[in-house]
A protein has these predicted regions:
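Bacterial N-terminal signal peptides
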Residues: 7-17
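Extracellular beta-strand-rich solenoid/capping regions of secreted or surface-exposed proteins
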Residues: 37, 41, 45, 55-68, ...
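Right-handed parallel beta-helix
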Residues: 68-72, 100-114, 135-146, 157-173, ...
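Extracellular beta-strand/beta-solenoid scaffold signature
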Residues: 79-98, 120-132, 145-153, 170-203, ...
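Right-handed parallel beta-helix/beta-solenoid
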Residues: 15-45, 53-55, 71
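Positively charged n-region of N-terminal signal peptides that target proteins for export
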Residues: 1-4
Length: 343
């Protein structure tokens, strides 16, 4: 009897009684599932969704998955796809109530087609990838064409945004939604989106995010003067690292709006409200903003956005806690407001 029990214990430890661990599946679009949304709905946490060449509507991501584009599939605006207000979104990770079940998601190899988007034409994608309160997200090797806001993390921690290309970045002017003009946004969860605890609460503040090796190009349309355009916007965030990005936010002499490669700020949206604490412990190194109107802008005064700031070998004009007066000397319009990202 003793030997039988011992043998049973050995078998249990070796094979029989170990918990079954489900292996990740690969769900293929369109070979097995017609749409990306159908694949997300069918997936379990940890599954891979592999998308073949073609044009596809966007999707709402509500679980941890790896989205892999093979042959640069295009994500287009669709009437049945995710929206923010009236604007269409490519991949939307909503994160209600300060929690996001899609944390840990990876997205690579897609083309987000926002060509021609404007306040007068909201059929293309306005926002490429948009998330709230998501953690440990990896966004790499994607192309964004047009769009008013390519990659957005609101209140998200430990993102890796690497080797993406954003071309023809534009805005949704104030004849309509009045937002956008930002390539990559790392921003405080604030106002109606914020979780309890206020602006200083860790749950609302983005932390430990990396933005590496991206190319961002765009500029304001003629006559645009409502707010600035920004390649990389850091709004009241902590421990953000921004390395080796190529920033081409060109000047448009026919527009009063300022084009900024990287902006660190604790104000936005024309309200005059400051969010405190401001930007803290930021590393900006090896970024090239020579083809931007201004490469780096750090707004504020009295160190509001310079606590722990480290700058190293960035190229292009840099303005640290200085008024933007010089940028408007040759323009009759008033100095535009700071950035106005979609929240």
């Amino acid at each position: 009897m003793g030997r039988g029990l011992l043998l049973g214990a050995v078998l249990c430890l070796g094979l029989e009684c170990l918990p079954q661990v489900a292996s990740a599946k690969v769900l293929r679009v369109p070979e097995k599932l017609a749409t990306i949304q159908a694949a997300v709905d069918a997936a379990r946490n940890g599954d891979e969704i592999r998308v073949s060449p073609g044009a596809y509507c966007g999707a709402t991501i509500d679980k941890r998955v790896e989205l892999v584009g093979v042959g640069h599939p295009r994500i287009i605006g669709c009437a049945g796809g995710p929206v923010l207000g009236v604007a269409r979104v490519g991949f939307y990770l909503p994160g209600p109530n300060g929690k996001n079940p899609a944390s840990g998601t990876k997205i690579s190899g897609f083309v987000f087609d926002g060509r021609g988007v404007s306040s007068a034409n909201l059929e293309p994608i306005s926002f490429g990838i948009f998330a709230r309160f998501a953690r440990d997200i990896e966004i790499s090797h994607n192309h964004f064409e047009g769009t008013a806001q390519a990659i957005t993390s609101t209140g998200g921690d430990r993102w890796r945004i690497e080797h993406n290309r954003i071309h023809d970045l534009t805005v949704l002017d104030c004849t309509g939604p009045c937002t956008g003009g930002d390539g990559i946004v790392i921003q405080l969860a604030r106002d109606e989106v914020a979780a309890p605890g206020g602006d200083a609460a860790p749950i609302n503040r983005p932390e430990d995010n990396l933005i590496l090796g991206n190319t961002i190009e765009g500029g304001p349309p003629d006559g645009f003067a409502d707010f600035s355009m920004v390649g990389i916007l850091i709004l009241a965030a902590d421990h953000t690292t921004v390395l080796q990005n190529d920033l081409r936010l060109r000047d448009n002499p026919a527009a009063a709006a300022v084009s900024q490669g990287i902006l660190l700020t604790n104000t936005c949206c024309g309200t005059g409200k400051s969010y405190l604490p401001g930007v803290r412990h930021t590393i900006l190194a090896f970024n090239d903003g020579r083809k931007s109107e201004v490469a780096i802008v750090v707004e504020g005064s009295g160190g509001a956005n310079t606590q722990g700031l480290f700058l190293f070998r960035n190229r292009g004009e840099q303005q640290l806690e200085t008024a933007q007066l010089l940028l408007s000397l040759s323009r009759s319009a008033a100095i535009p407001a700071s950035a106005r990202p979609q929240l």
